[in-house]
């Protein structure tokens, strides 16, 4: 049996995938731009 690897934490979620984390890097800003262009209702976690 393999262990359950997903241990949810909202703090870790926000820090790695949140809006401010995205805005902090050039690549992250490109991610947001792509999601805006696609018309996503939610841009980030």
UniProtKB/Swiss-Prot annotation:
Biased composition annotated in UniProt, kind: Basic residues: 11-20, 31-45
| Polar residues bias locations | 1-10
Instruction: State the Pfam families in the record.
Output: Ribosomal_L34
**What keywords would UniProt list here?**
Ribonucleoprotein, Ribosomal protein
Domain of life, source organism: Bacteria
Q: Does the keyword Ribosomal protein apply?
A: yes
Indicate whether Phosphoprotein appears among the record's keywords. no
Q: Name one GO cellular component term.
A: ribonucleoprotein complex
Any one GO biological process: translation
Q: Which GO terms describe its molecular function?
A: structural constituent of ribosome
| Chain segments carrying region Disordered | 1-45
PROSITE patterns (UniProt xref): RIBOSOMAL_L34
Tell me its family: Belongs to the bacterial ribosomal protein bL34 family.
Q: What is this protein called?
A: Large ribosomal subunit protein bL34
Species assigned in the record: Shewanella oneidensis (strain ATCC 700550 / JCM 31522 / CIP 106686 / LMG 19005 / NCIMB 14063 / MR-1)
